Regions:
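Catalytic domains of riboflavin
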Residues: 1-358
Length: 358
């Protein structure tokens, strides 16, 4: 069973190795991760012994530019767009670069802000990976998880990661990963838990405008929001205020250009009539394909990662908009049944799901 984020961060900040597992519909695999600044030869030897031996070092875009670490290939065709740079060794070590001591030294040098591009030989035995800005909130991969763990622990944002393997050469998955973490007394966390932790503690939206607009049921108060992840504004429309913020009838709207143009008016009128009957209501309009907070069901095709990452962001953006409006619990007006996860982390409760029939 995964440990709490707080337990993992405490262990990570003290230089311990931790195990991080991603989603089953992505890879379902576990990586050993340690902060590069605290990586010792002993920890590197443990990593090499229990993993594929391909040791990677997640870094930020800023550090990659500073150290002139160019992409390994011009056109990335990997299944999960893992951003490999050219491989490196640390020149001052002077050896082949393959030993645990030399690889640990190279990783520590990557985390040293005083190190420069000329301190590293190319190619080498450490494989830097460029993490997406925004971390696990933008890409739910081990690369981003490693950098996020460093940042959340107050350490230089460079990690060391490698994928856990069984003795027969197969990749560890699921319960195998959990048993490994338990047998070696390593803290274990999922990327999903890291996403939820960040969402509940970071401000993902900013109110940028307030306005009033007319509607068939009377004036609506509009609130426009921006997030770091979207170029366009999200909007919430409030009918008759939210009062004490409890049991507020709420509709999350998923934009669909064709539907909204040709059949959307009837649906919106029905939503507004429900608001009028209830006496108050909130319509959260998350643009650019955002639907609100549904996490399941998810698309089954391999391209689902982008959809899943977007939906994780919607959990935070949609919930934080409600929180900004003073809403603490909602009656969810929905035309389909979803599994809504993540709202409770923002102090928002779904009291009921009420069917929207058009």
């Amino acid at each position: 069973m995964p440990d709490t984020i707080q337990e993992v961060l405490q262990a990570f900040a003290s230089g311990e190795l931790v195990v991080v597992t991603d989603d089953e519909d992505r890879e379902g695999e576990g990586d050993l991760i340690v902060a590069a600044s605290l990586c010792t030869p002993e920890k590197m030897a443990f990593i090499i012994r229990h993993t594929s031996g391909i040791v990677c070092a997640p870094i930020t875009t800023e550090d990659a530019r500073r150290l002139r670490l160019d992409p390994m290939v011009a056109h990335n065709e990997s299944n999960h767009t893992t951003a490999f740079t050219v491989s490196i060794d640390y020149k001052p070590d002077g050896g082949t670069g393959i030993s645990a001591e030399e690889r640990a030294s190279c990783c520590r040098a990557l985390a040293n802000p005083n190190a420069g591009a000329n301190d590293f030989a190319r190619p080498g035995h450490i494989f830097p990976l460029i993490a997406r800005d925004g971390g696990v909130l933008l890409r739910s991969g081990h690369t981003e998880a490693a950098v996020d763990l460093c940042k959340l622990s107050g350490l230089p944002p460079v990690g060391v990661i490698s994928e856990l393997m069984n003795d027969d050469g197969t990749v560890m998955k699921g319960e195998q990963v959990a048993r490994f973490a338990s047998s070696h007394k390593l803290k274990h966390v999922t990327i999903a838990d890291m996403i939820a932790y960040r969402q509940a503690r970071e401000k993902l939206i900013e109110r940028v405008a307030t306005f009033t607009t007319d509607s068939p049921i009377g004036p609506l108060q509009g609130y426009a929001y921006r997030s770091p992840f979207d170029e366009i504004a999200h909007v919430a429309f409030v009918y008759n205020g939210v009062g004490d913020g409890k049991n507020v009838l709420t509709r999350f709207h998923k934009p669909n250009i064709v539907r909204d143009i040709f059949t959307g008016q009837k649906r919106m009128l029905t939503v507004l009539e429900h608001f009028k009957k209830s006496g108050r209501g909130v319509l959260v309009y998350l643009r650019d394909g955002a639907a609100g907070v549904p996490v399941a069901p998810l698309p089954q095709e391999k391209s689902a990662e982008a959809d899943r990452n977007r939906q994780w962001r919607e959990v935070g953006v949609g919930a934080q908009i409600l929180r900004d409006l003073g809403v603490t619990s909602i009656r969810h007006l929905t035309s389909s049944v979803h599994d809504y996860k993540g709202l409770s982390g923002f102090g928002i409760e779904i009291v009921s799901n009420e069917q929207l029939e058009v």
